[in-house]
């Protein structure tokens, strides 16, 4: 037996939201564009409607109104298209995407773009912790601060934050690049395998095996290109940090040395 809450969201007998797997068919479609008003829709209904109009209707430009900080919006879209959120999604927005170009005119919660493969997500505000967790490709651009553990387990792609970043940014980073224009809290690049982190402000402390690097012409070209693409103005003076290649090269260490490093 299902129950209806005051907000209009339906729950099944186990308390799991939205047992109905059918899209609501409420989007306003006009040629190659569509608008979804998410005010009275559950997360599942919003995502079902988004996938319907992108895959079944072939719409390439979608605007989602009133996302209401609902979690897990815009996930699993595996097609090139343009998606605009007018308002703020909650946690886990735009995870597991491969191709979309997403514009978020608001702020966003934890784990933005988790396991993103390609495309871009631009946020006109801050983002929470775990931004770009396990990012594999594409660009995440946050016009503001990002929280703790940004780019944890990052495997590719680029994360740009015009503000500051929290603790353990770049933790266990494997590949890819980050550009943090402001300050970074303790543990930058802790246990990173590879990749590069550029920082414009002060670093509270470096994590294990994260060391300063030397900027070169390729770094400058890359940074200038990304700032030009996303109209971010002139880049600040940035410092480069990279992996010292000690922690994870165990074959080159004696057992006693491993204990010291760890």
Predicted feature descriptions by range:
Residues 148, 154-167:
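Glycine- and acidic-residue-rich phosphate-binding/metal-coordinating active-site segment common to enzymes
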Residues 127:
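Active-site-adjacent structural elements in folded domains
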């Amino acid at each position: 037996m299902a129950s209806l809450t005051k907000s209009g969201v339906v729950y099944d007998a186990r308390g799991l939201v939205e047992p109905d797997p059918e899209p609501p068919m409420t989007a306003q479609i006009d040629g190659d564009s569509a608008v979804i008003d998410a005010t009275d829709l559950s997360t599942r209904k919003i995502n079902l409607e988004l996938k319907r109009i992108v895959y079944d209707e072939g719409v390439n430009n979608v605007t989602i109104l009133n996302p209401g900080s609902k979690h897990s919006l815009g996930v699993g879209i595996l097609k090139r298209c343009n998606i605009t959120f007018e308002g703020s999604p909650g946690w886990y927005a735009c995870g597991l995407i491969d191709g979309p170009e997403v514009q978020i005119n608001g702020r966003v919660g934890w784990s933005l773009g988790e396991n993103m493969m390609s495309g871009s997500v631009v946020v006109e505000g801050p983002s929470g912790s775990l931004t770009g967790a396990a990012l594999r490709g594409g660009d995440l651009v946050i016009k503001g601060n990002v929280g703790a553990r940004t780019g944890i387990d990052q495997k590719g792609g680029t994360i740009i934050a015009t503000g500051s970043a929290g603790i353990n940014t770049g933790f266990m980073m494997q590949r890819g690049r980050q550009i943090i224009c402001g300050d970074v809290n303790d543990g930058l690049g802790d246990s990173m395998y590879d990749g590069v982190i550029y920082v414009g402000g002060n670093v509270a402390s470096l994590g294990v095996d994260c060391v300063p690097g030397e900027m070169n012409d390729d770094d400058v070209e890359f940074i200038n290109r990304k700032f030009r693409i996303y109209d971010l103005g002139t880049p600040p003076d940035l410092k480069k940090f990279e992996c010292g290649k000690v922690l994870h090269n165990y074959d080159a260490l004696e057992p006693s040395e491993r204990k010291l490093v760890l």
